[in-house]
Structures are given as structure tokens and as C-alpha cells.
């Protein structure tokens, strides 16, 4: 979900990112990054001759970009196919981080290598493929406004019933310090009466409370 600006692309000799969401390929991604670096040092070629940076005017939240389902599954399956071409070192689709308030907040395709034609064509292929399926991405879980979601949770017999605040998700770059949701939850009597609904709220940073 990284946001790659033109400046970052220009000043990064080698760059790569995860190819699975959820990020089950963390180990593979680290290995790929290290192997690319070591290989370039050992063969004496150093920096890649060419870098293709293609901004794609798409902005998607992580909850819509799972690679376990379509279209993400097929889209990301094309990444290693591009990387396997002669003259290509790495290929990546950066979905972008939707909650970042900055100009570089959009998707990007990056391909690096020593063959200009292979790098260019690979980047264009991935960018066009991404654009072609831009309207097919859907939320991987039910979504509702806060009040409707809470009403559904309170009426359900399922335990636990989990609600996620997509806009302040500390596992996806959020600070986790927005208290609005917790404040609204505590207004409900169901969480204050004996024998009422129990609530676990995770999480808001509280260094002083931890120290106590």
C-alpha cells in the first residue's frame, strides 16, 4: 500500500513491494529485495540502467485489494511474469495508501532492469491491466455506516463480533489515536449495565496507563 512519488522512484536504486494482500509473502519479499541487491553488487552491474515509473490514477483502500479474490488475484499474478522477462530485475504494483493526505497518494507501477524495451513494455502492461479492472474491486467484508454496523453487532448472537474502523487502522498505517469511535460506543447503555454486552476496544495508545 505504499505511495511512490516520482522523487522516491528517482532516488531508489532498487525497489520492490509485497505481492500478496494480506501480506503472506513478507519473507519472500525481503528475500527478493536482498537477492536483487547482492546480485547487482556481485556481478558489478550496480544500479539498473532503466526504471519505469507509471502513476495510475486509482485510489483504493486495502479492504478492496485482496489478492485472494478477483480481480486482485489475477492482476498480481502478472507481476512475476513481467519480472521473469530477460532484462528485468523487479516489477511491482504499488496500490497506494488511501488514507495518506499527500499529493503522491495514488497507485504506481514500477519496473526496473537493464533492457529498456522489456522494462517499458512490462510497466505498461501492468498499468493497463490495473486500469482495465479498476471498477471491479469490491470490499472483502460487509460495510456499513457506524450506527448500522453497531446495531447489527448488538443484535447478533455471534461471539466475537468484530467491527473495524477502516479510517484509523494501526495495522495499515493509521495512528490508532482517534477517539471518536470509542466515545460513540460508550454512549450506549448496553455496555454499562450489569450483564450487558461486553466490549473490547483495540486499541488506543496509552503510555501512562501501561506504566501504571
Tell me what each language-model feature is.
Residues 1-47, 160-182, 186, 190-206:
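Active-site histidine-anchored catalytic micro-motif
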Residues 4, 8-11, 29-37, 71, ...:
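General structural feature for long, well-ordered alpha-helical segments within catalytic domains
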Residues 19, 23-27, 86, 90, ...:
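Generic local-structure boundary detector
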Residues 45-54, 60-151, 155:
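Accessory alpha-helical/coil subdomains and C-terminal extensions
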Residues 60-62, 202-211:
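Short, conserved secondary-structure transition motifs
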Residues 65-71, 152-154, 170-179, 212:
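Short glycine/threonine-rich loop-to-helix capping motif typified by GTGT followed
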Residues 105-109, 159, 195-199, 211:
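Structural beta-strand/beta-sheet cores of well-ordered domains, especially the beta-sheet scaffolds
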Amino acid at each position: 500500500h505504499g505511495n511512490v512519488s516520482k522523487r522516491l522512484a528517482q532516488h531508489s536504486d532498487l525497489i520492490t513491494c509485497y505481492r500478496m494482500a494480506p501480506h503472506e509473502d513478507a519473507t519472500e519479499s525481503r528475500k527478493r529485495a536482498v537477492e536483487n541487491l547482492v546480485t547487482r553488487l556481485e556481478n558489478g552491474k550496480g544500479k539498473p540502467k532503466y526504471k519505469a515509473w507509471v502513476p495510475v490514477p486509482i485510489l483504493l483502500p486495502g479492504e478492496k485489494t485482496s489478492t485472494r479474490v478477483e480481480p486482485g488475484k489475477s492482476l498480481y499474478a502478472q507481476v512475476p511474469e513481467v519480472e521473469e522477462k530477460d532484462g528485468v530485475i523487479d516489477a511491482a504494483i504499488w496500490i497506494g495508501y488511501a488514507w495518506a493526505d499527500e499529493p503522491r497518494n495514488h497507485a504506481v507501477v514500477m519496473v526496473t532492469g537493464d533492457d529498456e524495451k522489456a522494462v517499458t513494455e512490462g510497466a505498461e502492461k501492468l498499468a493497463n491491466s490495473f486500469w482495465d479492472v479498476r471498477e471491479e474491486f469490491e470490499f472483502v467484508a460487509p460495510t456499513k455506516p457506524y450506527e448500522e454496523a453497531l446495531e447489527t453487532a448488538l443484535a447478533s448472537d455471534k461471539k466475537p463480533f468484530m467491527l473495524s474502523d477502516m479510517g484509523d487502522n494501526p495495522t495499515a498505517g493509521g495512528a490508532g489515536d482517534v477517539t471518536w469511535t470509542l466515545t460513540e460506543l460508550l454512549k450506549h447503555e448496553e455496555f454499562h449495565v450489569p450483564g450487558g454486552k461486553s466490549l473490547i476496544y483495540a486499541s488506543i495508545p496509552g503510555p501512562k496507563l501501561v506504566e501504571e
